[in-house]
């Protein structure tokens, strides 16, 4: 089992799919990485040599923000919005949808479980 960016990559899957187990790498970026390293898309992780795994690791470390660094960056961006006091920051602070979704009904994922209100029985 290869270990890239602190994540154990499954050995029986194709490299394109296996790279997507790393937070911050989707299908497009996985394809770009394999293109840079010149590894065929249909090759399995178990067929990779140690040198190829090392090349993939170097490309990811050099060019992409993944795993903990990406999570930290996103957290810092959200904290910055909240400190600014802009509309998006206020929505984050209040735990409401940020991107303009309706809140009269729905939005339960963001708001949490429904709170019981006295006198609202059927």
Swiss-Prot record:
GO cellular component: cytosol; small ribosomal subunit
GO molecular function: rRNA binding; structural constituent of ribosome; tRNA binding
Region of interest (Disordered), ranges: 99-122
UniProt-listed SUPFAM superfamilies: S13-like H2TH domain
Keywords: Ribonucleoprotein, Ribosomal protein, RNA-binding, rRNA-binding, tRNA-binding
GO biological process: translation
InterPro entries reported for this sequence: Rbsml_uS13_C, Ribosomal_uS13, Ribosomal_uS13-like_H2TH, Ribosomal_uS13_bac-type, Ribosomal_uS13_CS
One Pfam family it belongs to: Ribosomal_S13
Function: Located at the top of the head of the 30S subunit, it contacts several helices of the 16S rRNA. In the 70S ribosome it contacts the 23S rRNA (bridge B1a) and protein L5 of the 50S subunit (bridge B1b), connecting the 2 subunits; these bridges are implicated in subunit movement. Contacts the tRNAs in the A and P-sites.
Protein family according to the UniProt entry: Belongs to the universal ribosomal protein uS13 family.
Subunit structure, as described in the record: Part of the 30S ribosomal subunit. Forms a loose heterodimer with protein S19. Forms two bridges to the 50S subunit in the 70S ribosome.
PANTHER family: 30S RIBOSOMAL PROTEIN S13/40S RIBOSOMAL PROTEIN S18, SMALL RIBOSOMAL SUBUNIT PROTEIN US13M
Protein name: Small ribosomal subunit protein uS13
Taxonomic classification: Bacteria, Pseudomonadati, Pseudomonadota, Alphaproteobacteria, Hyphomicrobiales
Name of the gene this protein is made from: rpsM
